[in-house]
Amino acid sequence: MTILVDMDGVICTEEKTFERALAKPMPGAREALAALKAKGHTLIIYSARTWSELRMTEAWLKQHDIPYDGIHLGKPVADRILDDRAVRFTGWDAALKDLG
């Protein structure tokens, strides 16, 4: 299964644009993503960050040992997203349960 994973507020804490390199990993993020990879899932980071933040984002992911298979930046910003395949993120324990 291919899983799109948001960056800010899911993998790491929400920070202002120019402070994103200082973000902290969300509790359980690395372990949960590693467990999903171990089950054979493909993990794509899907974020509203801009492409100019790509190198910084890749460096942050490497520094915090976050597994992923690809990155897609420039997700449209909206007040709400309607999607028939979405899982509302409330924490990594619940996300792992929802994803099976």
Describe the predicted segments one by one.
Residues 1-100:
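HAD-like aspartate-dependent phosphatase fold
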